[in-house]
Design a protein with these regions (language model features):
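The feature marks the mature, well-folded catalytic cores of soluble enzymes
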Residues: 1-268, 274-330
Length: 330
C-alpha cells in the first residue's frame, strides 16, 4: 500500500483493558488446568481475531448452554450473564468459571440494590448488547432500557420520585452525559451510582481519540462491528470532525479513504490485540514515514482472577501458570 502519508499517530492508551486481559487469561488458564473440552458461552470478548486464536488453542465457543454437555466446564464471557443463565448452569451440574468484567459486575450489583429498594431503574445502553441483556436479567420488571435522550420523555414509571439510572460500561461519555442530563430534568429526584458506570478504559480511549482527532485527517479504528466500545470511538472521532473508519484488520482499508491524508491516526477498541495495530502500521508506513505515540494517560489497572480457577487448579494439583504472557500471546 504505497500512499503519500507523512506521519502515523497512534492513540494511547489503546487496546486491551483490564477486563479483557483478565477474560482472555481466564480462557487460556482454564485450557491449561482443566480437563478438555472447555466451553465458552458467547464470544469471550467482541473480537473475531481473539476468538479464533482461542478456538485454535482448544476453546469451544457456543451461543447457549444447551450446546454444553452436562458436567462440562463453561466460561461466561466478559459481558456478564443474567441470573437465569447461572441458575441453569447450576441445575445442569456445569463447572462454571465467571469471566464477567468486575466493572460489569458492579453495574449488576447496583441494579440488584436499586430493585430491592423498590426503585424503577433506567438502564442507558443498547438493548441488543450482551452486557445490557445480562444486567436487564437482574430485575426485568423494574429496568427500562433506553439508548438516547429523545427516549426520556416517553418513559413511564410508577413513582417519579423513586427512580435510578445505570449505564452500560462501553458507551460514549458525551452521549451518556446528554441522556443523564435529560433524565435529571424530567426526574429531579433521580439517583445514580456514586461513580460513573462507564469504565475507565472506555473514557481513556475516547479521550485519546479526541486528542488525536485534531491532529490527523483520517482515523482508523480497528475493532469488530459488534464491539460497542470500538463503534463509540468512531462516533467520537466523527463528532470531532475527523473522517473515521472501523476496520476488522488491514485488509478492510480502502485507498480512497486515505486520499490526500498526510497524517493518519490509528487506534483499536478495548477488545482488539496490539498485533493488528502492528500489521496496520506496517501496511501504511512507506519509506521515511514517521510513527508517533500520542498519550493522554497511563493505565495500571489489573483485576484478580476468579476463585474458581484456583479451586480447579488445586483439585487437579496443577499450579496456575503466570499471567504475564497470557493475553500477550495473541
Amino acid at each position: 500500500m504505497s500512499l503519500p502519508i507523512a506521519e502515523i499517530l497512534l492513540a494511547g492508551p489503546r487496546g486491551f483493558c483490564a477486563g479483557v486481559e483478565r477474560a482472555i487469561d481466564i480462557v487460556e488458564l482454564a485450557l491449561s488446568v482443566c480437563q478438555p473440552p472447555v466451553y465458552v458461552r458467547k464470544e469471550i470478548v467482541h473480537n473475531r481475531y481473539v476468538v479464533e486464536a482461542l478456538r485454535a488453542k482448544g476453546a469451544i465457543f457456543v451461543d447457549e448452554l444447551t450446546e454444553v454437555p452436562d458436567d462440562a466446564t463453561v466460561i461466561f464471557s466478559a459481558h456478564g450473564i443474567s441470573p437465569e443463565v447461572r441458575v441453569e448452569a447450576t441445575r445442569r451440574g456445569l463447572r462454571v468459571i465467571d469471566a464477567t468484567c468486575p466493572l460489569v459486575t458492579k453495574v449488576h450489583l447496583e441494579a440488584i440494590r436499586y430493585a430491592r429498594e423498590n426503585y424503577s431503574i433506567v438502564l442507558i445502553g443498547h438493548a441488543d448488547h450482551d452486557e445490557v441483556i445480562g444486567t436487564l436479567g437482574e430485575a426485568p420488571d423494574r429496568i427500562h432500557v433506553i439508548a438516547g435522550a429523545e427516549e426520556v420523555e416517553r418513559l413511564r414509571v410508577p413513582d417519579p420520585e423513586k427512580i435510578a439510572y445505570l449505564t452500560q460500561t462501553t458507551l460514549s461519555v458525551d452521549d451518556t452525559r446528554d441522556v443523564i442530563d435529560a433524565l435529571r430534568r424530567r426526574f429531579p429526584r433521580i439517583v445514580g451510582p456514586s461513580r460513573d458506570d462507564i469504565c475507565y478504559a472506555t473514557q481513556n480511549r475516547q479521550a485519546a481519540v479526541k486528542r488525536l482527532a485534531s491532529d490527523v485527517e483520517v482515523l482508523l479504528i480497528i475493532g469488530a462491528a459488534n464491539s460497542s466500545n470500538a463503534n463509540r470511538l468512531v462516533e467520537v472521532a466523527q463528532m470531532a470532525g475527523t473522517r473515521a473508519y472501523l476496520i476488522n484488520d488491514v485488509r478492510d482499508i480502502r485507498p480512497e479513504w486515505l486520499a490526500g491524508a498526510h497524517r493518519v491516526g490509528v487506534t483499536v477498541g478495548a477488545s482488539t490485540p496490539e498485533v493488528l495495530v502492528s500489521q496496520t502500521v506496517e501496511a501504511l508506513a512507506g519509506r521515511g514515514v514517521a510513527v508517533r505515540e500520542v498519550h493522554v494517560v497511563e493505565e495500571d489497572v489489573r483485576f484478580a482472577l476468579p476463585q474458581e480457577l484456583d479451586e480447579i487448579a488445586g483439585e487437579r494439583g496443577v499450579p496456575l501458570p503466570s499471567r504475564t504472557a497470557m493475553h500477550q500471546s495473541l
